[in-house]
């Protein structure tokens, strides 16, 4: 078999007339003293910044395997000057975007709202914004507190987000036309102690699940994950249910990811806190029926899921599904991004080395119908800085497509990347 090589790698700007023009933007990444993995200071020269909100960068990736086949990765700023983008694709192939937008452009401003947009592939842009949050709130500068989104079988968009001042998660859903969102409502009453990171939400058919971590912050080894389940598209939810084992603990300031395997099976990936130091990536599968949990099981840990650390790493992870309904998890261990096919009984695998010796963080994953798997993340981050965008592309068989991405794209403060598959099988990346 002929090896896969990067035949063409060019970064181009897509203008309003969809013509392609070469660019050579170089952006400054300042030293990162808060990054515990970064051992050396570094400086990047800068000669230009992206100045137009919503400007699109295209990375054309020519991949050779016998005959030429071209995969395209469109790299685009989050619309509206927004940050913390979340992308999801529904069963019909529609791309949905959730993001936070500040009300004022001043650097010190924090207050704003969540907005939703649907991607219009024929026009290569997102549609008009629709406000999600009923009241404005201050953005959390940590990625772990990000909002989450899922799309149900009837077309409704379901959103959950975290407000630390209220020590509460809030939920809202759209109408089936996705033209407006209902008044936000609180999620937690019983298991609300020690909320310190974002919840996640999943949907399939008429089922919706909201999952979060809770418990005393001073006793991480006794925390666990909880959830509420709806079987009527979010109209009503179950009582709050304990879903995880308290024997494993739960890292207080790491977010989690959840996804439905089928209408009665929920996958939850979260970081434990065994004896306060075993911050391993746990893969929990919960079986339930009629809003009641019937059973739960943990998958055996592989080496790359294990992380001994006495402090909280403030990490995030992401789950998506391929064309064969296999669930894929991307996560961080010791400053490196890893990938794992859930339920396959195989070990987690590393993704790629960083540009320089520094920390990789906040991964997202998207998989097209051919099985090509794109993983994106940030590097040289801090608590507030998004860092430098990096990515890696894998073929369906796990082989490395080695796109050779070397672009210097700076992720905005407080933000992280997101990825989705376009209807034509190409990829969209927001930052």
Where are these regions (language model features)?
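Short alpha-helix boundary/capping segments
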Residues: 1-10
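Position-driven detector of the extreme protein N-terminus
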Residues: 2-3, 28, 40, 90, ...
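Repetitive helical segments and hydrophobic/amphipathic motifs
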Residues: 10-13, 22, 26, 64
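Short hydrophobic targeting helices and cationic amphipathic motifs
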Residues: 18-22, 26, 33-37
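Bacterial N-terminal signal peptides that target proteins for export
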Residues: 40-57
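Bacterial N-terminal signal peptides
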Residues: 54-66
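Extracellular, repeat-based ectodomains that mediate carbohydrate processing or recognition
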Residues: 70-431
């Amino acid at each position: 078999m002929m090896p896969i090589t990067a035949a063409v790698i060019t970064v181009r700007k897509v203008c309003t007339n969809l013509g392609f023009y070469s660019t050579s933007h170089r952006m400054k990444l300042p030293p990162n003293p808060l990054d515990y993995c970064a051992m050396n200071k570094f400086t990047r020269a800068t000669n230009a910044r992206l100045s137009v909100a919503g400007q699109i960068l295209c990375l054309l990736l020519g991949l050779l395997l016998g005959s030429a086949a071209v995969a395209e990765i469109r790299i685009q700023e989050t619309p509206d000057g927004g940050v913390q983008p979340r992308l999801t694709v529904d069963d019909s192939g529609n791309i949905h975007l959730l993001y936070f937008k500040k009300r004022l452009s001043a650097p010190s401003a924090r207050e704003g709202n969540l907005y939703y947009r649907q991607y219009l592939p024929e026009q290569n842009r997102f549609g008009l914004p629709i406000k999600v949050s009923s009241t404005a709130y201050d953005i959390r500068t940590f990625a772990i507190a990000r909002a989450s989104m899922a799309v149900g079988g009837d077309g409704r968009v379901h959103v959950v987000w975290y407000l630390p001042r209220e020590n509460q998660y809030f939920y809202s859903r759209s109408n089936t036309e996705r033209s407006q969102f209902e008044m936000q409502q609180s999620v937690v009453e019983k298991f609300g102690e020690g909320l310190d990171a974002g919840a996640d939400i999943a949907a399939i058919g008429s089922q919706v699940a909201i999952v979060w971590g809770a418990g005393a912050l001073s006793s991480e080894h006794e925390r666990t994950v909880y959830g509420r389940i709806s079987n009527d598209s979010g109209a009503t939810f179950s009582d709050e249910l304990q879903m995880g084992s308290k024997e494993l603990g739960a890292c207080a300031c790491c977010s989690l990811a959840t996804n439905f395997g089928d209408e009665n099976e929920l996958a939850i990936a979260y970081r434990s806190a065994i004896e306060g130091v075993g911050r391993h990536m746990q893969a929990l599968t919960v079986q339930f029926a009629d809003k009641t949990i019937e059973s739960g099981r943990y998958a055996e840990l592989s080496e790359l899921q294990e992380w001994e650390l006495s402090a909280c790493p403030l990490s995030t992870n992401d789950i998506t599904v391929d064309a064969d309904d296999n669930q894929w998890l991307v996560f961080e261990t010791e400053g490196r991004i890893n990938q794992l096919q859930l339920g396959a009984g195989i070990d987690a695998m590393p993704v790629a080395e960083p540009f320089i010796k520094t920390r990789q963080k906040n991964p997202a994953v998207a998989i097209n119908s051919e099985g090509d798997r794109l993983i994106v993340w940030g590097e040289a981050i801090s608590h507030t800085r998004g860092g430098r965008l990096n990515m890696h592309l894998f073929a369906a068989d796990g082989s490395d497509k080695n796109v050779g991405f070397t672009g210097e794209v700076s992720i905005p403060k407080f933000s992280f990347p997101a990825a989705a598959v376009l209807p034509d099988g190409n990829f969209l990346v927001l930052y």
